[in-house]
Amino acid sequence: AFLCGWISFWATDPPSISIMALAIVNYLAFFVPIHGLVLKLVAVVFVLIFMGVHIRSVEGGGKFQIIITALKILPFALVIGIGLFNLQGDILLSSAPLKGYATGGIAALIAGVATTTWSYDGMGAACYMSGEIKNPKKNMPLGLILTAVIVLALYAGLTFVASGILSIDEMATSDAPIALLASKLPGIGQYAGTIVAIMAIIVVIGSLSSCIMFQPRIEYAMAKDNLFFKSFAKVHPKYETPYFSIIVQWAVAIV
């Protein structure tokens, strides 16, 4: 745990913040031409905004996460809902093997586990906030269980729909399989690029906000236990948030 905390601060958390901020602006470039230094400056603005939100209020940051999470679910539900009525039986029931890839055995199992594990990897992040949650003994298990069920349903539904509309080779070779799936759905096909770009922006904004919210709590908790620099245990006198930890992580992410 000690090593994980230090690695998180120096090697994983700030880079993930910067990568997500840049990803948001890259998706925005689908609508507005943004390049070079301007792109990076806009990414910095996004980080600054969420830093301010999460320093100012834990409750306000939590409410924003609820809103952005609801907005994340809606487009997935739309694609799944329309897709279920447009499944192609011959594709869904096809047993054609994937060319050039392992189709069975330990190699295929490892590849599948690696991919799906990454998709569910963020679940533990909710526990970082347990010290600031009302009635955590009840709400933490409930939140983790409901989150797992909802995410599993969305992922399974999206995978099922994609498997009934896209061939296995299309899914394997496409750089943007969700965009390809949306392009084949009636009613939204002609707007697939726009819809997927908006979906991506919403999803990454939610991820960026949550990372800025929960990641500094690792260093904050370690500092309280004298396992990290003591200054990271500072709490804002008015907002009661670990402002120093949030600010330093923001600064490292921008660099």
Predicted features and spans:
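TM-loop-TM module centered on a large, flexible mid-protein loop between adjacent transmembrane helices
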Residues: 1, 29-34, 143-209, 228-255
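Hydrophobic, membrane-embedded alpha-helices of multi-pass small-molecule transporters
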Residues: 46, 82-83, 99-162, 190-212
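Membrane-interface loop-to-helix entry segments
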Residues: 38-89, 103, 144-148
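Alpha-helical transmembrane segments of integral membrane proteins
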Residues: 4, 38-46, 71, 107-111, ...
